[in-house]
Amino acid sequence: MYPKIEHHGGAQGVTGSCHQLWFDSEHSLLVDCGLFQGQEVDDSLPALERLTIDFPTETIQALIVTHVHIDHIGRLPYLLAAGFRGPIICSPPSAHLLPLVIEDALKIGFTRNKSLIERFLKQVKQQLVVLPYKQWHSLIDQKGLAVKVRLQRAGHILGSAYIEVDFNDVSPQDSLTDDVTESKRIVFSGDLGAPWTPLLPAPRSPYRADILVLESTYGDRLHQHRRERSQQLEHLIEQAMACGGHIIIPAFSIGRTQELLYELEHIIHRAEPGSMIKSLEVIVDSPLAAKFTQSYRELKDWWDKEAWRRYRQGRHPLSFDELYTVDGHDEHLQTVDYLSRSQRSTLIIAASGMASGGRIVNYLKAMLGESRHQVLFTGYQAKGTPGADILRYGPQGGWVKLDGEKYTIQASVHQISGYSAHADQKDLINFVKRMRYWPQEIRLVHGDDQAREALKDQFEQLYRESIGFDGQVILAN
């Protein structure tokens, strides 16, 4: 029975997103091809086999990328190695950012051979198809089968999209600008952003969906309001500065780092002259984050109205006087050594966001053992990652393993949920409620069991109270 959806990752967890939509036995579409992280990595397999594409690629007509986070595109090199040569469809900003992410991923997990990397990136760029938002693109148009796709802004990171797929098995040869009422529409949410994500407009719901594949990362909770999270961040900065300590923030290079810089610029801008915060230095110690921040500046045509208003006032939300970047590895080591001895408070942003690697690890090794420092998490911490362990055991004075060694946690540990670039439970429900025609089937993906179960209960109650039946809400597997 078609259409049929097969999940190759990101169904029962929050990493490794990869979904295959089958139109018939010979034609399919792949949505994302992400890397597994944390406990979702199969440690029983050799390292290279964990990433091998274990499904046939011959039927895949295209790969559509919802956004360029590594848990959504990290297996792309292995997909191409498996023989996929079809179009890689993404939004204009994602087309700009994707080669940067893939280059970094290749250097970390595949090879540092420049010639091989350049050859691979050339192949990726040859396959990239840039699809503007809101524009239908015909993927298949043949006798007995017509498929078209459209991207809409998802508000998660710059370039993020949710995907509308119109599938019709009688090939009506309709105009691509018209809706086909007899077609079946499948929507893949990708990662949906919160309504107040800095720099990005809030996502708007689709007109209709017959089947909705919906993320559920925060399906069991509500985020703090933007004003509350900003006040909490400001309070933590003041607390650290009063103690002569540093604020250490593990953050994704793409999206989260830029959101934090945007918020920090505003906090410093509005601070009273002569206040401690006016003298706060902000360090971004991540070459990839620095590259992406520059790309975000270049892609300002995609910013939201608030960001443009600040820019027109002469402010530079992603490039302000108090901001410094650390480039080379030697400079990084010198910075860690200097700051570990310094009493002048600094806010440090470095990857990785779950503290599972990258330069943040050296800062944590140097500073977790001192109570004057603050460690602040602003994003989801997958089970099995050092970030999750620090959050869990830090308040108890426990320890965490970093690079195989135990480090006692004396620093204060905090989490601000409001900085999540993911929609919360209310936002996810509103995404459906604001459709003109609600889905007949909702498949919940990209969430742990607790989050998916809680969201399933909410949707079933919503359908029961609004239209008299539970709806078909499925926990994908």
For the regions a protein language model found, what residue spans apply to each?
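Conserved beta-strand hairpin/beta-sheet module of binuclear metal-dependent hydrolase folds
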Residues: 2-53, 61-62, 162-168, 172-189, ...
